Amino acid sequence: PVHLENDANCVGLSELLAHPEIENAACVVIGTGIGGTMIINGKLHRGRHGLGGEFGYMTTIAPAEKLNNWSQLASTGNMVRYVIEKSGQTDWDGRKVYQEAAAGNALCQEAIERMNRNLAQGLLNIQYLIDPDVISLGGSISQNPDFIQGVKKAVEAFVETYEEYTVAPVIQACTYHADANLYGALVNWLQEENQW
């Protein structure tokens, strides 16, 4: 038998596999766009239309950039596009942006800080929307400890600046990083076959 599931939902299922003690969690998958899922009371929350956790569709206000959702504003894909537009060079990818930033490239540092700030805003929205035990970040970029640290620092900066934020989200990398959707697909299959 074959069972299908949304890839971001599979990431959430993989976190249930790795951390069965977690009751409430959000998983945010960052790549060319942003995907996500919610775990509520230890179960995947799909919502009425199957859109539960589709955080990338959260509306943002960035009229100067003509971007209207979090996926367009805060993804790795947008970070790379920003560097391409500002530099006029097309041979960029996320890994190169981080390498050049570490070597002192001011444009790449700016692009990363911009992405981190935009991610932090969305992560704080998620924190105050569902109050999860943890928010796990996935996608290939989650393997980069500098990325995780940068996002945490951006969240901390918002929390320190605005006294209304009394709780900061617990942020971590997805346990299985870029392979999380594969492990989650296995969990989905086992659940559908009543073996989990």
Briefly describe each language-model feature range.
Residues 1-68, 184-196:
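Phosphate-binding/catalytic loop of phosphoryl-transfer enzymes
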Residues 15-24, 60-196:
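ATP-binding/phosphotransfer module of carbohydrate and carboxylate kinases, centering on a glycine-rich
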